[in-house]
Regions:
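N-terminal helical cap/lid subdomain that shapes the substrate entry/recognition surface
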Residues: 2-99, 103, 107, 120
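Substrate-recognition "cap/lid" segment bordering the active-site pocket of phosphatases
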Residues: 89-90, 118-165
Length: 165
């Protein structure tokens, strides 16, 4: 797979959309909350492009779909509570990711996850995916002062896995 990998000591993955497809569980949680408020559901495929912006991004998309401003503070807390209980129903590793992880481990390359998502969700997802023992580090949004794209989480991951920066 990798030709000259002597220089590669570790690989860090983002969680949502890179390592795993979490979009269906996020969409289902959002749609349950929208249903409770008699609002239109969102299309899960279209929602994917908003997921990188977290709960606020998906709620903004719901506002667009519904053609009106939605009270994001209330909806956000309801959405996050539902998602906490349903964050690993349909979530899966992305296509061929299991093979890539196996390969990296066979080459003794450390693997880590760096995400803006809160640890209360990430821990359940990582455990559900069955990869918690394969990871040298997991850095979540609540572990750093400044979320990505700031470098705080990447620097923390490098420190944890003792990777030269």
């Amino acid at each position: 797979m990798l030709k000259n990998n002597k220089e590669i000591l570790s690989v860090l993955f983002d969680l949502d959309g890179t390592l795993a497809d979490t979009s269906q569980d996020m969409c289902d949680s959002l749609n349950r909350i929208l249903d409770l408020r008699n609002l239109k559901q969102v299309d899960c495929v279209n929602l994917r492009k908003y997921i990188s912006r977290g709960a606020i991004g998906v709620i903004e998309y719901a506002s667009v779909v519904n053609g009106k401003s939605i009270d994001s503070s209330l909806l956000r807390s309801e959405f996050l509570e539902d998602y906490k209980n349903n964050c690993f129903i349909k979530t899966t590793l992305n296509k061929d990711m299991d093979q890539l992880l196996d390969y990296l481990l066979s080459e003794q390359i450390k693997i880590g996850v760096v995400t803006n998502k809160h640890s209360r969700y990430v821990n359940k997802i990582i455990k559900g995916l069955g990869i918690e023992k394969d990871l040298s580090c997991v850095v979540t949004g609540d572990m750093v002062l400044n979320a990505k794209p700031a470098s705080d989480s990447l620097m923390k991951a490098a420190e944890i896995i003792q990777c030269p920066t």
